[in-house]
Regions:
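Helix-loop junctions and hydrophobic alpha-helical segments within the transmembrane domains
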Residues: 152-173
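Helix-loop junctions at the membrane interface of multi-pass solute transporters
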Residues: 143-155
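Hydrophobic, glycine/alanine-rich multi-pass transmembrane helices and their short helix-loop junctions
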Residues: 79-80, 169-226, 230
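Structured non-transmembrane domains adjacent to transmembrane bundles in polytopic membrane proteins
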Residues: 1-89, 93-114, 120, 256
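Hydrophobic alpha-helical segments of membrane proteins
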Residues: 69, 73, 102-110, 140-144, ...
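Hydrophobic transmembrane alpha-helices
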Residues: 77-80, 98, 117-141, 181-184, ...
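Membrane-water interface of transmembrane alpha-helices in multipass transporters/channels
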Residues: 85-95, 114-130, 188-204, 216
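Interfacial helix-loop-helix hairpins and adjacent transmembrane helices
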Residues: 214-257
Length: 257
């Protein structure tokens, strides 16, 4: 069915496609129409409609991801490098954040498709989930690895890693669980994109907190050893006295004969 609306300034040609608006065939039709219109000399026309809007949204989201993802990772690498004074540790920690995002988004896609019955994932969800997970993952990385460096200088690499995990594990795990529950509440909203963002971020935080930060990062740190902190030397200073040692009374010397 074709409808033509004319005015002195413009003409509108309305066409109903035989394919479903969200089908690949409809997308191919829109692309073909745009190519035909662009090939006409002096033509000044636009191809719109639901399929065209969805196509432009997808392309815009993909363009944003190609710019934002590398830019965010470069900024994170620079910040971690300045804080940790290392080249290897920031690369490793940034890689674990990317792994957390990829795993959580893959798991979320399965939930959206086979549990919730969604037709697909909104194009804005990957960008939102990536920004949230990178920001939160970097915070936990800084907490853990800053303490790991301090403890390694006092007690050696293996013992320092164990102590840093024991000292920061409760805080990181508690914060991660609370934050995951907060984002999980978004899944109760009757808005698909909010549901998808909430589930993706909540799963990512739980994976990052319970698996990556608690198991993967300490294990990789022990495997890499002192190269983790290259090129800064990881010197070992004597352990600082504990508060219990400071409060312990000094032994009185034996009385002289």
């Amino acid at each position: 069915m074709t409808t033509i609306n004319e005015s002195p300034q413009w003409n509108e040609l309305s066409v109903v496609l035989t394919s479903a608006p969200d089908s690949p065939a409809a997308t191919a039709t829109i692309e073909a129409l745009r190519a035909r219109v662009a090939a006409v000399p002096g033509a000044d026309a636009l191809v719109g409609g639901p399929t065209a809007i969805a196509l432009d949204t997808d392309r815009g989201a993909a363009h944003d991801r190609r710019i934002v993802f590398p830019l965010v990772l470069l900024v994170v690498l620079a910040v971690l490098g300045l804080l940790l004074r290392s080249l290897i540790a920031p690369v490793l920690l940034t890689a674990t954040v990317v792994v957390s995002f990829a795993a959580s988004f893959g798991l979320s896609a399965l939930i959206f498709r086979y549990v919730l019955g969604f037709a697909g994932t909104d194009q804005g969800v990957p960008l939102y989930a990536f920004i949230f997970l990178v920001a939160l993952g970097v915070d936990y990385n800084i907490f853990l690895m800053s303490r790991a460096r301090e403890e390694a200088q006092r007690h050696g690499l293996a013992e320092g890693t164990r102590r840093s995990l024991a000292l920061t594990g409760t805080v990181i795990t508690s914060a991660g669980v609370v934050l995951a529950a907060t984002f999980g509440v978004l899944a109760l909203l009757p808005i698909v994109i909010m549901t998808e963002v909430g589930i993706s971020v909540a799963l990512g935080i739980l994976l990052d907190t319970l698996v990556v930060r608690s198991i993967l990062v300490p294990a990789l740190s022990l495997d890499i050893g002192r190269w983790m902190w290259w090129p800064a030397p990881l010197g070992k200073s004597p352990p600082e006295p504990m508060p219990s040692d400071l409060k312990r009374p000094l032994a009185t010397p034996p009385a002289g004969r």
